[in-house]
Amino acid sequence: MWNSGFESYGSSSYGGAGGYTQSPGGFGSPAPSQAEKKSRARAQHIVPCTISQLLSATLVDEVFRIGNVEISQVTIVGIIRHAEKAPTNIVYKIDDMTAAPMDVRQWVDTDDASSENTVVPPETYVKVAGHLRSFQNKKSLVAFKIMPLEDMNEFTTHILEVINAHMVLSKANSQPSAGRAPISNPGMSEAGNFGGNSFMPANGLTVAQNQVLNLIKACPRPEGLNFQDLKNQLKHMSVSSVKQAMDFLSNEGHIYSTVDDDHFKSTDAE
């Protein structure tokens, strides 16, 4: 599953290291105002979308918007209908059944024989993270990550994240600046597997982290919930996803171990 890969909207989604976040300014650029900085920062959020939304996005002053939500970096989930490799790039047609298939271009490093240069075969369901682009009024994605789905629940999760993300961002953007709630920063799930929880809900946790935390909170036993019971209740998640969510919650002070390293209780427990 996708854990904290695009999991919230902050400076960068991948790995939390900011490696994919473009620098807002440039050499010789005038110092931007606070409003400009905030606007540009918002544009760096990785927003879960459908292809239909991307195709209907409007481009004004070099900024894409879906309604009042500014977008630049997005994620989509769909099936590859066609793949074509050229010397410097791979072009996919990806279909999520909300509109016509969309062109997704992934540039390849001709000096690198890594898996990033391997063509993902047609009829494979994938999650794509990339930048929305428009050329001659035709929209496409320039992908910086394409990952085959490991679990078809990720497709359903993505649709829920799309709804949640756009509701939250639309509400946030409609509020006065002074009263706008901060939007937290994303992370990455399993080694590059930008898990199905790209969006962080209001408490700053991913879907997977919230599921783990809520189960631990709900356990009435004094010693807390043990890992085996937790894993059995989260059969839709891989073991590594559960462990990563627990590691994050423990490091952030949401849960703590009790009688041994396999039993956990919430710090909010009575």
Swiss-Prot record:
Gene source species? Pongo abelii
DNA-binding region positions on the chain = 74-148
Main location (coarse class)? nucleus
Q: Fetch the Pfam families from UniProt.
A: RPA_C
* Record GO terms (molecular function): damaged DNA binding; single-stranded DNA binding
Q: What is this protein called?
A: Replication protein A 32 kDa subunit
Q: Kindly list the places in or outside the cell where this protein is found, as annotated in its UniProt entry.
A: Nucleus; Nucleus, PML body
List the PANTHER family. Answer: REPLICATION PROTEIN A 32 KDA SUBUNIT (PTHR13989:SF54), REPLICATION PROTEIN A-RELATED (PTHR13989)
| InterPro entries in UniProt | NA-bd_OB-fold, RFA2-like, Rfa2/RPA32, RPA_C, WH-like_DNA-bd_sf, WH_DNA-bd_sf
* Residues annotated with Phosphothreonine modification: 21
